[in-house]
């Protein structure tokens, strides 16, 4: 059984390939530059928006959602939007509430972890969790690991709790349970043993850490066809911000919602718009894979890429220097920021 939901998703209709006269006259689209207008009025399907710093990508994402709803291309319950921070999610909800005459309550807008929490709360039994499961923050997780190590006489100098917490988080970001982790020596085997004990402790105590929110949610979608298909039908329009900062598991989670593997090939459905900037990828130390952007283009057969290159924050001398420096990166997807603000001091 699925939770009651007044929205079953948007009709599988195509948005016009460009804004017509009536759409262009909409107050929603006022003051957008040509690049922003093209991004907001993209046809249904999969697209990549390369959004440089200060290019108004938050405005584009929010206006895109409002435009879809205003023109009847989506219902609130058919939209899922992923932001990088809780602050960005709250800002998006506030903007949409001000822009639209309808309630935005049916939309799923939040961070990966926030959305996974919502999904697991709705399907806690299928996920093997207590209805009232608690979430461990970073400090709570460290305390739990310290307590575990003390109970099992783990040498905390040889296996510092902070390093164990990092190891467990990394395993989960890679989608690995203890049985999936390669062990090449005694230290590796010991860390996997602690990982297993930690999972058992969390399950007994009815708690999950941030990594578990993501991994358990992914496994729920992967292993439960009716639940996965329900949300695939529902979310006809998905928008993901800061795509360059997604990790392996987050991208895999998105694919579960967006399509299925058929004959060894991924077949995506609905409309997924990824917004990101490979020049701003700074979270590799936390598992972020800038390569997810190229994988998205290939696996989702992306036919439309739009570059937001108009910068509204900086002077031209700053942008010229930044463009010159980043041009040495031969693996970037490529864009050049520009401004109308002049050279500055």
Question: Which residues fall in each region the model found?
Answer:
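Coupling/hinge elements of helicase-like and P-loop NTPase modules
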Residues: 156-166, 306-345
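Coupling/switch/interface segments within P-loop NTPase motor domains and analogous charged loops
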Residues: 138-205
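A short helix-to-beta-strand connector/capping loop
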Residues: 102-107, 304, 344-345
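Conserved helicase NTPase motor core
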Residues: 30-41, 45-50, 60-61, 80-81, ...
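Phosphate/oxyanion-binding loops and surfaces in catalytic or ligand/nucleic-acid-binding neighborhoods
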Residues: 99, 122, 126, 151-155, ...
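P-loop NTPase Walker
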Residues: 1-131, 135, 229, 280, ...
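Short, flexible turn/loop "capping" segments at secondary-structure junctions
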Residues: 41, 72-73, 274, 298-301, ...
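N-terminal helical cap/lid subdomain that shapes the substrate entry/recognition surface
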Residues: 115, 303-304
């Amino acid at each position: 059984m699925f939770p009651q939901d007044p929205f079953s998703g948007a009709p599988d209709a195509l948005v016009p390939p460009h804004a017509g006269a009536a759409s262009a006259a909409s107050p929603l689209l006022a003051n957008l530059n040509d690049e922003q207008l093209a991004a907001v009025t993209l046809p249904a399907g999969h697209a990549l928006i390369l959004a440089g710093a200060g290019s108004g990508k938050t405005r584009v994402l929010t206006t895109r959602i409002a435009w879809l709803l205003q023109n009847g291309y989506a219902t609130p319950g058919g939209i899922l939007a992923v932001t990088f921070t809780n602050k960005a999610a709250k800002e998006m909800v506030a903007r949409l509430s001000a822009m639209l005459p309808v309630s935005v309550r049916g939309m799923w807008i939040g961070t990966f972890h926030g959305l996974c929490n919502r999904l697991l709360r709705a399907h806690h039994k299928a996920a093997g969790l207590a209805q009232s499961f608690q979430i461990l923050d970073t400090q709570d997780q460290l305390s739990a690991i310290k307590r575990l190590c003390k109970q099992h006489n783990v040498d905390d100098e040889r296996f510092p709790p902070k390093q164990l917490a990092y190891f467990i988080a990394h395993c989960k970001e890679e989608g690995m349970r203890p049985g999936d982790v390669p062990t090449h020596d005694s230290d590796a085997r010991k860390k996997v043993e602690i990982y297993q004990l930690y999972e058992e402790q969390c399950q007994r105590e009815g708690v999950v850490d941030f990594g578990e929110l993501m991994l358990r949610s992914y496994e729920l979608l992967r292993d439960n066809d009716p639940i996965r298909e329900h949300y695939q039908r529902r979310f006809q329009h998905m928008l993901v911000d800061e795509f360059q900062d997604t990790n392996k598991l987050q991208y895999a989670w998105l694919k579960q919602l967006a399509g299925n593997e058929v004959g060894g090939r991924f077949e995506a459905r609905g409309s997924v718009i990824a917004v990101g900037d490979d020049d701003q990828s700074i979270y590799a130390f936390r598992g972020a894979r800038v390569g997810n952007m190229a994988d998205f283009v290939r696996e989702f057969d992306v036919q439309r890429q739009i570059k937001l290159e108009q910068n509204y924050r900086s002077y031209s001398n700053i942008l010229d220097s930044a463009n010159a420096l980043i041009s040495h990166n031969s693996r970037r997807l490529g864009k050049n920021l520009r401004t109308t603000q002049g050279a500055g001091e």
